Every structure is written in C-alpha cells, then in structure tokens.
C-alpha cells in the first residue's frame, strides 16, 4: 500500500 511503501498496489 501507499502507507506501507512495500507493495504500493493496495493503495492502503
């Protein structure tokens, strides 16, 4: 997700 910065695909 955006917050995790790892996947960046969840947008969470």
UniProtKB/Swiss-Prot annotation:
Q: Which GO terms describe its cellular component?
A: extracellular region
Q: What domain of life?
A: Eukaryota
Q: Which residues form a coiled coil?
A: none
The alphabetical list of record keywords is:
Amidation, Amphibian defense peptide, Secreted
Q: What is its main location?
A: secreted
Query: What tissues harbor this protein?
Result: Expressed by the skin dorsal glands.
Output the PTM entry. Answer: Isomerization alpha-beta of the Asp-4 residue in caeridin 1.2; a cyclic succinimide may be formed between Asp-4 and Gly-5 residues in caeridin 1.3.
GO terms in the biological process aspect are: defense response
- Tell me where in or outside the cell this protein is found: Secreted
Leucine amide modification, residue list: 12
Q: What does this protein do?
A: Caeridins show neither neuropeptide activity nor antibiotic activity.
Please report the name of this protein according to its UniProt entry: Caeridin-1.1/1.2/1.3
